[in-house]
């Protein structure tokens, strides 16, 4: 659609007039028609904020180019306009033989189809213990033989009611290892939390690496899908790291998903999409302040003043923090990136720490310039200087911050 690029943006109205874009009412999202699929759901147009001096469209396209540099899969983005409003177009993250399941849908389905069943099993198990006036496995073994048999029959029935897949059913008392089953039911207490899908400041409490991973494993089990464990975990942590590097603070559970291959039943993490909340380019005041602070730091020579200006810039940059956390308590406590980085470094294997270091090593002034050149070459339009400066400041700040924390972990000194 290069023939309808105007002022750096794909002109959607011109593309429609020339027959390059077709869409129908079913593909439209929202009453204002500011978000719609076109060309048989292969591309989407999305209007960005037009009321403030923000640059969400550049956040999307810079993150797309950055993801390529870091070898992280991401949806393709380009600048676009529709009805005089600026926006972006993005290619679908799925092919014809694939299905996208958003994180919210996945987490809720796992909760309803698995966690609730296990919670019900535990409550029923406690009632069964009361019925037989026992509390422990040892007390069970002291029951009269007939009571032990009836207890096992009832427990087998309760367990089967909690199973999603028929192949997990216990069909005969001879199949029961009562010690294992008794302890399994006992240990369900607190294992599947009631607040798994509760919201905290708009974020589902399970929107964290640990719970996402657990939910995907369970989803595969109850749905019969196949999971490449290492590949999925790598992609999941790459998403988390990408958000830390870019200050992506809007990775709620509708802004990530899984892709199911209908032919092979293999599940993978969807390519990254919707990065309009990255690089602070959606925050008007932050854009102005980061740009101003960075310019003042270049000319200020007085140490006390430099320290004060840097502290203000640091506070502004760190105001945004990752939507995806590591553990549920990180979500509930609304922990910011410094704590998340510390936990990630502490709890990650050496392999994942090295992977983090490799990605950080690619964030250089030269590579950032290369990203800007790639975008300007594609759009035939200069990127606003303020966008370049703010994006560069955030990327380099986060790179240096994470590297410093890695150095401390290894017993070295900060930069």
At which residue positions do the language-model features occur?
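Short alpha-helical "patches" and their helix-cap loops
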Residues: 77-84, 252-262, 408-412
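Conserved ATP-binding subdomain of kinase catalytic cores across diverse folds
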Residues: 3-146, 150-189, 193-194
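C-terminal catalytic region of ATP-dependent kinase domains
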Residues: 125, 129, 133-145, 151, ...
């Amino acid at each position: 659609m290069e023939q309808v690029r105007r002022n750096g943006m794909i002109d959607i109205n011109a593309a429609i007039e020339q027959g390059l874009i077709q869409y129908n009412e079913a593909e439209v999202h929202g009453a204002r028609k500011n978000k719609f699929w076109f060309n048989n759901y292969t591309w989407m147009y999305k209007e960005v904020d037009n009321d403030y001096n923000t640059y969400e469209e550049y956040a999307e396209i810079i993150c797309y180019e950055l993801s390529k540099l870091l070898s992280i899969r991401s949806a393709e983005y380009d600048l676009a306009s529709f009805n005089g409003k600026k926006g972006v177009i993005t290619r679908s993250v799925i092919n014809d033989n694939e299905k996208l399941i958003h994180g919210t849908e996945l987490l809720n389905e796992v909760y309803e189809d698995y966690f609730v069943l296990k919670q019900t099993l535990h409550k029923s198990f406690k009632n069964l213990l009361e019925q037989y006036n026992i509390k422990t496995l040892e007390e069970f073994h002291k029951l009269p033989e007939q009571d032990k048999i009836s207890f096992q029959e009832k427990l087998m029935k309760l367990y089967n009611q909690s199973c999603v897949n028929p192949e997990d059913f216990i069909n005969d008392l001879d199949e029961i290892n009562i010690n294992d089953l008794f302890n399994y039911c006992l240990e369900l207490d607190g294992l599947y939390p009631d607040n798994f899908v509760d919201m905290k400041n708009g974020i589902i409490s399970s929107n964290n690496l640990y719970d996402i991973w657990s939910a995907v494993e369970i989803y595969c089990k109850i749905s019969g899908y196949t999971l490449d464990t290492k590949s999925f975990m790598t992609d999941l942590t790459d998403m988390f790291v990408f958000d830390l590097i870019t200050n992506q603070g809007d990775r709620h559970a509708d802004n990530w998903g899984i892709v199911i291959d209908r032919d092979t039943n293999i599940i993978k993490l969807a390519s990254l999409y919707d990065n309009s909340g990255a690089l602070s380019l959606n925050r008007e005041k932050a854009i102005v302040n980061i740009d101003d602070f960075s310019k003042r730091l270049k000319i200020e020579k007085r140490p006390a003043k430099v320290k004060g200006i840097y502290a203000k810039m640091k506070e502004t940059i760190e105001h945004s923090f990752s939507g995806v956390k590591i553990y549920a308590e990180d979500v509930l406590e609304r922990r910011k990136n410094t704590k998340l980085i510390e936990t990630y470094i502490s709890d990650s294997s050496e392999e994942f720490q090295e992977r983090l270091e490799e990605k950080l090593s690619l964030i250089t002034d030269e590579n950032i310039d290369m990203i800007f050149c790639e975008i300007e070459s594609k759009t035939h339009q200069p990127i606003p200087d303020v966008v370049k400066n703010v994006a560069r400041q955030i990327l380099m700040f986060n790179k240096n911050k994470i590297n410093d924390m890695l150095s401390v972990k290894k017993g070295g000194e900060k930069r």
